A protein has these predicted regions:
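Acidic-glycine-rich active-site phosphate/pyrophosphate-binding loop
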Residues: 30-35, 51-54, 165-178, 217
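A glycine-biased, small/acidic residue-tolerant capping/turn segment at secondary-structure junctions
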Residues: 33, 269-294
C-alpha cells in the first residue's frame, strides 16, 4: 500500500482537527484503531499496511498536535517487537489483537518492577525490554499503582509483575540487544514527532492570539519585539522539523535519533514556555490550553532520557568517531 505524507496528514487532521484538545481517551483510542494507524509500519504479510517510518511520523505528529491521549507509542513498540518474534507461536494472534486496539503497553527497561508504564490499567500485556531479554508478559495478577504526573493527557503507572507471570520470549542475547536498540530508536522518533506536532499547534494558537488581542488600539502581532520572538520560535521549530523528516527514512543511527529526540523535545519546551509568556496574564492561568502543551512537553523531555543526557552522549559519540 502507498500513501503520501499529505494524504496521511489530511486524514489525521480530519479525524482530530475539529475536536477539542486532549479528546476523550476511550473514544480517541477506538478511532485510532479503526483508522488503522496502529498497523502503519507492520509488514503487509503480517496484516499491516507496510508504510514505513514516515507514515508513523505523520501519525505521531498529528496526535501530538491535538494532544491525543492513549498509549500509541507503547503500543507501536509492542507491535514492532512482536513482528520480529519469528519463533513465537502466538505472534500472529497477538499482532492482530494489538492492531485491533487491544491495549498492550511497554516499559522502558529493567525487570520485576517497572515505573511509568502508560495505561497499564487498561493493558492486557506488558513488553519488558532490556539488553539481554525481551518478552511479552500478561498482566493478570500484576500490582499497579497510579503515578502522579503533571501531564493530564497521559496516565502512567508503576507495575510489579506477579511472581508466576508467564513470559512470551521474543528475543534473547545479541538478538535482544539489537531489537532493544531498534525499539529505542523508534521511541525517540515517536516522541520527537509528538513534540514537533504539539509545538506547531501551540505556536499557531499563539500567533492567532497575537493577531486578535489588542493593546494601544493595535493588534499585539504588530509589535516588533513580539514579532521577533515568534520568528525565532518559528525558525527553531522549522529546523527541528526538517531534521525530523530527514530521519524518517528509517536508516538513521540510534545515537542520531536520540539527538533528534533531544532537539525536538527541547524545542517543544522552549515554544510552550514562550507561548505562556506571549499570552500574557491569561497564559499564566492553569486552565489555559498553554499549560496542556507545556506539561506534555515537560513529560516528553523526561521520557526515555532527558536532553542533557542525550546531548552529552551524542557529543561523546561524535568525538569518538571523528
Amino acid at each position: 500500500m502507498s500513501m503520501s505524507r499529505a494524504e496521511l496528514q489530511n486524514a489525521a487532521s480530519r479525524a482530530f482537527g475539529d475536536a477539542n484538545l486532549a479528546p476523550d481517551a476511550e473514544q480517541s483510542w477506538q478511532l485510532i484503531a479503526d483508522m488503522g494507524w496502529l498497523m502503519m509500519t507492520v509488514p503487509e504479510p503480517l496484516g499491516g499496511l507496510g508504510l514505513g517510518a514516515e507514515a508513523a511520523g505523520v501519525i505521531h505528529s498529528e496526535l501530538g498536535r491535538a494532544l491525543v491521549p492513549g498509549p500509541v507509542i507503547a503500543q507501536m513498540l509492542v507491535i514492532e517487537a512482536l513482528a520480529a518474534a519469528d519463533q513465537l507461536a502466538e505472534r500472529d494472534d497477538l499482532i492482530a489483537r494489538a492492531m485491533g486496539g487491544e491495549v498492550m503497553t511497554a516499559s522502558l527497561g529493567g525487570s520485576g518492577a517497572f515505573a511509568c508504564i502508560p495505561d497499564a490499567d487498561r493493558a492486557t500485556h506488558l513488553l519488558t525490554i532490556d539488553a539481554n531479554r525481551i518478552a511479552l508478559v500478561p498482566l493478570e495478577g500484576a500490582k499497579m499503582t497510579p503515578r502522579e504526573t503533571w501531564d493530564k493527557t497521559r496516565r502512567l503507572f508503576d507495575v510489579v509483575l506477579a511472581r508466576d507471570a508467564v513470559r512470551f520470549a521474543i528475543a534473547e542475547g545479541d538478538a535482544a540487544a539489537a531489537l532493544a536498540s531498534r525499539l529505542d530508536t523508534q521511541r525517540h522518533f515517536a516522541l520527537a514527532g509528538d513534540s514537533l506536532g504539539g509545538a506547531a499547534a501551540i505556536l499557531a494558537l499563539t500567533i492567532d492570539y497575537l493577531k486578535t488581542r489588542r493593546q494601544f488600539d493595535r493588534p499585539l502581532a504588530l509589535f516588533q519585539a513580539l514579532k521577533h520572538r515568534v520568528a525565532d520560535l518559528k525558525t527553531q521549530h522549522a529546523a527541528a522539523e526538517a531534521l525530523f523528516w530527514s530521519r524518517a527514512t528509517g536508516n538513521a543511527h540510534a545515537i542520531d535519533m536520540a539527538a533528534l529526540k533531544a532537539l525536538a523535545t527541547t524545542t517543544y519546551r522552549t515554544v510552550t514556555e514562550e507561548a505562556v509568556q506571549l499570552h500574557g496574564g491569561i497564559g499564566l492561568t492553569m486552565e489555559h490550553h498553554c499549560h496542556l502543551f507545556l506539561k506534555r512537553a515537560l513529560l516528553n523531555c523526561a521520557l526515555g532520557g532527558d536532553a542533557d543526557h542525550w546531548e552529552e552522549t551524542a557529543g561523546r559519540h561524535a568525538l569518538a568517531t571523528a
